């Protein structure tokens, strides 16, 4: 079987076209009123996963329980979600031509990005053509760009963050690091999983941090130069994740999740997190504000903004709470909800979609 072969003998059928008289209806109304169908019937709800890892696998299972037809795409065959989906594909999702060909073939009603290495221009074009991107193509683009996300969170929404500067050259990085002070953290504005990040404790290490950021950024093989963010190294006591659900019913925040990391890698999480009085509510307020801002961007672009968001927060030694980043999908620390809640983050994501 080739990498592009299907893993089950399923006949592909396109979803029925939206009648012309409903074209002016909002994306949220269309999504809420979409008949779910049955996965092997004539008119299934067709869901395409872009990324087929462990988290995607759990979401795929929940969507299939609700009656959706699922195709899981990743850069290699045999990824976890591909092993449970109705069909799978292996391709370079950052390649615009390959991704467009996949959309043309599958004709998805719903697209669920589970990774960040995606040709976002093609994703946005497909959303504009009527597909529901989860939570939205606009949100996916914002959340994979630290500069856009930080500007939204701090400068537009007024959320507390570490002091930061952006730099597009080594000289700008030197100046920015001097302004925020040492020690500081340097990250590419476009990277994931800690790639390209470094802690800089003196001006002597700035050159090495710039090189590390350029080599670790997303699409480092495409040449040019990546902008970076340099931010003060906060006196961190611990980190929290607040799962936040956006759906047709509004926005709901969940009890904060505590976590432990080693060398930047997630090791364990627990819910509820152990926090002093008032900390949970402050954390949930920050998470709600962040997601409200993102959903507003999605709706302004004509999209729903529905789904689960993992809002990452820093708790400092003085008890203050800072916004860090947002994952516009179920969060790895949220896997604990499979044991701690009646509905896991994956079930919530599927229902919100």
Locations of regions flagged by a protein language model:
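ATP-binding N-terminal substructure of ATP-dependent carboxylate-amine bond-forming enzymes
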Residues: 1-151, 171
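Internal nucleotide-binding/catalytic subdomain
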Residues: 200-311, 315-317
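A conserved helix-loop-beta module that forms one wall/lid of the active-site cleft
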Residues: 137-197, 203
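Short catalytic-loop micro-motif centered on adjacent basic/acidic residues
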Residues: 110-113, 163, 229-231
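ATP-dependent carboxylate activation and anion-phosphoryl transfer catalytic cores
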Residues: 3-7, 25-36, 50-52, 289-353
């Amino acid at each position: 079987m080739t990498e592009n072969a299907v893993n089950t003998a399923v006949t592909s059928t396109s979803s029925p076209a939206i009648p012309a008289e409903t074209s002016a209806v909002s994306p949220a109304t269309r999504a809420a009123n979409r008949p779910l169908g049955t996965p092997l019937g004539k008119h299934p709800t067709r869901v395409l996963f872009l990324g087929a890892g462990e988290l995607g696998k759990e979401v795929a299972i929940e969507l299939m329980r609700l009656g959706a037809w699922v195709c899981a795409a990743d850069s290699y065959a045999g990824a976890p979600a591909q092993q449970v989906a109705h069909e799978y594909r292996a391709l370079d999702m950052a390649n615009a031509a390959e991704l467009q060909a996949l959309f043309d073939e599958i004709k998805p009603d719903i697209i669920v990005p589970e990774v960040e290495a995606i040709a976002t221009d093609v994703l946005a074009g497909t959303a504009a053509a009527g597909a529901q991107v989860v939570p939205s193509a606009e949100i996916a683009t914002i959340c994979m760009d630290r500069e856009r996300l930080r500007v939204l969170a701090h400068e537009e929404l007024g959320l507390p963050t570490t002091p930061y500067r952006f730099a597009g050259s080594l000289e700008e990085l030197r100046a920015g690091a001097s302004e925020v002070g040492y020690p500081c953290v340097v990250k590419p504005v476009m990277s994931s999983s800690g790639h390209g990040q470094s802690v800089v404790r003196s001006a002597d290490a700035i050159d090495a941090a710039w090189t590390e950021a350029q080599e670790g950024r997303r699409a480092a093989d495409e040449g040019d130069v990546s902008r970076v963010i340099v931010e003060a190294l906060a006196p961190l006591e611990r980190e929290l994740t607040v799962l936040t659900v956006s759906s047709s019913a509004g926005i709901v925040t969940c009890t904060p999740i505590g976590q432990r990391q080693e060398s930047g890698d997630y090791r364990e999480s627990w819910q509820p997190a152990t926090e002093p009085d008032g900390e949970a509510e402050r954390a949930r307020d920050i998470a709600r504000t962040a997601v409200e801002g993102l959903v507003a961007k999605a709706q302004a672009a004509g999209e729903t903004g529905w789904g689960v968001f993992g809002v990452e927060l820093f708790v400092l030694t003085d008890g203050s709470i800072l916004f860090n980043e947002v994952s516009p999908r179920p969060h790895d620390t949220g896997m604990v909800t499979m044991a701690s809640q009646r509905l896991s983050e994956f079930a919530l994501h599927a229902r919100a979609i």
